[in-house]
Amino acid sequence: MIIKPKIRGFICTTAHPVGCEENVKEQIAYTKAQGPIANAPKRVLVVGSSSGYGLSSRIAAAFGGDAATIGVFFEKPSTEKKPGTAGWYNSAAFDKLAKEEGLYSKSLNGDAFSHEAKQKTIDLIKADLGQIDMVVYSLASPVRKMPETGEVVRSSLKPMGETYTATAVDTNKDVLIEASIEPATEQEIADTVTVMGGQDWELWINALSEAGVLADGCKTVAYSYIGTEITWPIYWHGALGKAKMDLDRAASELNNKLSATGGSANVAVLKSVVTQASSAIPVMPLYIAMVFKKMREEGVHEGCMQQIYRMFTQRLYKADGTAPEVDEENRLRLDDWELREDIQKHCRDLWSSVTNENLFEVADYQEYKDEFIKLFGFGIDSIDYDIDVNTLIEFDVESI
C-alpha cells in the first residue's frame, strides 16, 4: 500500500510503518550515543508505551540500561485495507530492534484501565521476569471504561469558572483564531479526574504489589505537565489540572507504600512537546511553536527522548546513587529549562504581537507542523513515500 498522511482535525488518521520505525531508530541512536545509564532498572513495565514519553521511557530503559521491558498499550493493528496506528508501528519497531540486541521485549495490546490488563501483565511478569523494579505510568486517554460497571467516562479539556478566550492557531489552515471554550461543569471536572487522575495508577501499583511482583526498591513514575500562566487557564487551572493534582495525591499515597520496601513513587513534570495528546489542547500548538524557538536559540530544547534520558540519568538513577532533587510536592521537575524566566518572558511578550503574517517567522510553527506529521511516520527526508510498503507488521504482542 502507498500511504499518505490524512489529517482530520488535530489527528492524522494514517501512519507509515517505515517512518515510524525510523523515529524509533532515531531515539535509540540518541540513547546509545549518550552512553549507558548507571544504576538502571533491569525489569521495567511501561503502561502506555506506544508513543510520546511512554515510548521514550521504554527505549531509555532497554537501550540505555539493557532492561527487559513489558509494554502495555491500546493500538489498532493494520488490516489489508488500512494501515495500523502509529503506536502499533512504533511498538513493532521497538520489539524488532530490542530483539536484535538480545533484549527481552513483550507487549500487551488492550484497555489498560481494565482488570484483565492488570492480571495479564501480572501473569506475564510472574512467568518471564519474576518481579519488576520500575513501573512507568504514561497513559494519555480521553476516555476510561470503568472496570466494575462498564460505564464509559470522558474527560474535558475545559477551563473552570468562566469562559476562556485566547489566541490559538488553526493548524489545518495555518491562521490565528480566537478560541473560546465554555467552562467545565462540576460533573465534567469529576469525570476528568476519573479519567486522567491518579486512580488507575494506584490500581496498577496496588495490583502489582498484592501479586508480589514488585521488587524491593521498585520505583514508579507518572508523567504530568504544569506549564505557565499562558496555558494555565486551559491546563493547570482547568479540569485537566484537577486531574493532574489528583496524580500528585496518588503519588503521595503510593510513595508511602513503596518507601517501606526502599522504593518510591513520583510525578515527573515534563516539558511541553509535540504529541498526539498536546495537539488536542487549544493554545498548546501556538505556545509550543513559540517556546521551542526560544529554547532552541538558548540551546536547551529537548524532545521526548532527551527529556526522559535526563530524567533517568539526572533524577531517578543518578550515577552517584544520591536521591533525586524534588520540588515541595515531591515531584521530579524536568520542565525547569522551559520555565526559565527569560524563556517565559519571551513567550509572554510575543503572544500579543503574533499575526498571520509573522507566525512562521517569530515562532517555530513550521517545525511544529513537521514534528506533528513525523509522529505518524511522515515527512522524513530519507523515506520515499511513493513506494508501496507492507502495512501488515506483526510482532510479539498479545491481545488483552
UniProtKB/Swiss-Prot annotation:
Record-listed substrate binding positions: 225
The organism's place on the tree of life at top rank: Bacteria
Binding of NAD(+): at which residues? 48-53, 74-75, 111-112, 139-140, 244, 273-275
Root EC class? oxidoreductase
Q: Which key words are in the record?
A: Fatty acid biosynthesis, Fatty acid metabolism, Lipid biosynthesis, Lipid metabolism, NAD, Oxidoreductase
What catalytic activity does the UniProt entry give for this protein?
a 2,3-saturated acyl-[ACP] + NAD(+) = a (2E)-enoyl-[ACP] + NADH + H(+)
Please state the Enzyme Commission number of this protein.
1.3.1.9
Matching entries from Pfam families are given as: Eno-Rase_FAD_bd, Eno-Rase_NADH_b, Enoyl_reductase
* UniProt GO molecular function: enoyl-[acyl-carrier-protein] reductase (NADH) activity; NAD binding; trans-2-enoyl-CoA reductase (NADH) activity
Fetch the InterPro entries from UniProt.
Eno_Rdtase_FAD-bd_dom (IPR024906), Enoyl-CoA_Rdtase_cat_dom (IPR024910), FabV-like_NADH_b (IPR050048), Trans-2-enoyl-CoA_reductase (IPR010758)
Annotated site residues (Plays an important role in discriminating NADH against NADPH) in this chain: 75
Name its pathway: Lipid metabolism; fatty acid biosynthesis
UniProt-annotated catalytic positions: 235
- Cysteine pairs bridged by disulfides in the record: none
One annotated GO biological process: fatty acid biosynthetic process
Q: How does it assemble?
A: Monomer.
Q: What does this protein do?
A: Involved in the final reduction of the elongation cycle of fatty acid synthesis (FAS II). Catalyzes the reduction of a carbon-carbon double bond in an enoyl moiety that is covalently linked to an acyl carrier protein (ACP).
State the family named in the UniProt similarity comment for this chain.
Belongs to the TER reductase family.
What is the protein name for this chain? Enoyl-[acyl-carrier-protein] reductase [NADH] 1
